[in-house]
Amino acid sequence: MNLRKNVIRSVLRGARPLFASRRLGIAGRRVLLATLTAGARAPKGTRFQRVSIAGVPVQRVQPPHAATSGTLIYLHGGAYALGSARGYRGLAAQLAAAAGMTALVPDYTRAPHAHYPVALEEMAAVYTRLLDDGLDPKTTVIAGDSAGGGLTLALAMALRDRGIQAPAALGLICPWADLAVDIEATRPALRDPLILPSMCTEWAPRYVGSSDPRLPGISPVYGDMSGLPPIVMQTAGDDPICVDADKIETACAASKTSIEHRRFAGMWHDFHLQVSLLPEARDAIADLGARLRGHLHQSQGQPRGVVK
């Protein structure tokens, strides 16, 4: 294990008591997460514009020299309660640059001010409005990390069930997709330096509210995976949430839905946020971007390059 990776792991472990402490409050932990996400710096020359789509604030992210080959709709993480579009726009910019796309990062309403299904319905409204305004779904991908990864999968299921044109592909980074195990406090502990199962147990009820946590809109691992766009998924071996990805992969195999799953051994939840510091994170973002871009070519009927 290299020195830089060791240092980052130690920093995250040092921050864990603050994230786990309810005494800090939601506002305090939002500030703490914003400090960590700031480590994902956008490529130099990236342009940002704040817009509104279907009444939802959105960060429009244009990486430098990015080809206008497609649109990345990026749903940020943060346990449905802590993250923000501004805080995650650096990560979205890195992925957009790797994929050669422009990114849109919606600021969905967070828990506990809004429970399920508010965020899901807002994202469905944003996507539908974009289609109405001329967005081509064949050159569009939806991606997200952690809670945003679960929301990405739930959104794709909702679009399918409503007969709305699907995007070309989905990108899932360490998806939090089974909140039922957290309501029941049965998530296993692994070696993640930051994430503890007890944190998931705290945050899941804030989003679930009085709903059934096994609803596919909340925990898409319990939903029907058939008829979904191709999925590109990346996970971390030390992340206790990685078991959700295993359930997704198993369900996709059963329904014959295309899925590419790459697990990074010895890495932690959302290590992609250290893209400006860690070679492993840069490799992950470059690989995810290339694979998502490849699905655009495939959906347009163009020859698809081999992605290794």
Swiss-Prot record:
One of its GO terms (biological process) is response to acidic pH. It comes from the Bacteria. The active site is at S146, D239, H269. The keyword NAD does not apply. It is an enzyme of class 3 (hydrolase). Residues 1-40 form the signal peptide. GO terms for molecular function: triacylglycerol lipase activity. GO terms for cellular component: plasma membrane. Induction: Expression is controlled by VirS. Induced at acidic pH and in macrophages. The keyword Hydrolase applies. Required for maintaining the appropriate mycolic acid composition and permeability of the envelope on its exposure to acidic pH. Belongs to the 'GDXG' lipolytic enzyme family. This is Putative acetyl-hydrolase LipR. It comes from Mycobacterium tuberculosis (strain ATCC 25618 / H37Rv).
